[in-house]
Amino acid sequence: MTAKKWFQLSEEGAGKLRLQALKFMFDKLGEFPVRIIAFFVVLSVFLQAKDRRNASLKFFKIINKKHLLLSAYRQFLNYGNSLVDKFLSVMGKLDPQKFELPEEDIFKSAFFITTHVGNVEIMRSLFQLKNKFEPKRVNIFLQANACKIFNDFLKTLELHIPEIEAFPVEEISPHTSIEISDRIQNGEIVFMAGDRISAQNENIAYEAEFLNHKVKFPLGTLKFALMLNVPVYFIVCVKDRKKYKIFAEKFVSDKQKRTEKLEDLKLQYVNFLEKYTLMYPEQFFNFYDMWE
């Protein structure tokens, strides 16, 4: 039987009623009970979500990790805690002082290609710090159907962060490209994931060596980044003990032709992804079979 793509997997454990209960518990009792709830929800998902569990076990086998089942469960648990952190971030209750930033000031006029290592979405807490960052708009491209239940629930909170605007990645058009280019020129920044192929563009992909296996990655993100002709960075935000560490690397190429630059971009991005996947394997939140 062919393994499911990530966009074909249902969102076990993320029902609207559960999230409403989560908010109720958070409002009444605080963060610690929410973490306890997350533990049991993750345990339920781990036991019931066979496709996700098998994909996780396969990943840890590929990287020669010992204690496969324990590593897989820790990966699930880390993901559950990352959702709680995301929840706290949107509620404005995640302490921005818990972040360790890159030494270089990179958060201006740039295009960031993200990964599903760690939890880059919680960086929204940083951009609410007016004394640390100049007011600017952050533009995020998301899969329209990614974590739909969770995102719909966040909308019911009626929280609006004017500095952040989300775009559906499936709806990129020439008009979008012009608008985003103008925004970056005005000091805004853009985030877009580079490690998941969308349902609409499943055939627009390139194949690369990742963890000694051939894996397909989306080509659209890389082409879009080059087309804008702005500084491009690869970025992850991972939890290390009680702090979130942000690692970023700038894309550099001396090639003149766009096709040659694209090849450099493919190589450097996959190398970056592999590096931090191996450093933080239990925060590699791709719960589907990339290696089918």
Question: For the regions a protein language model found, what residue spans apply to each?
Answer:
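Membrane-anchoring hydrophobic helices of lipid-metabolizing enzymes
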Residues: 1-114, 118-119, 153-156
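Short, contiguous strand/loop micro-motifs
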Residues: 9, 43-44, 141, 167, ...
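A structural signal for well-ordered alpha-helical scaffolds and beta->alpha junctions
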Residues: 15-18, 37, 53, 72, ...
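Catalytic core of membrane glycerolipid acyltransferases/transacylases, capturing the structured
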Residues: 68-71, 109-171, 201-203
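Short, flexible loop segments at the rims of nucleotide/cofactor-binding pockets, characterized by
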Residues: 89-98, 165-171, 210-212, 256, ...
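Short coil/turn connectors at secondary-structure junctions
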Residues: 108, 135-136, 188, 230
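Non-catalytic C-terminal accessory region of glycerolipid acyltransferases
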Residues: 129, 174-292
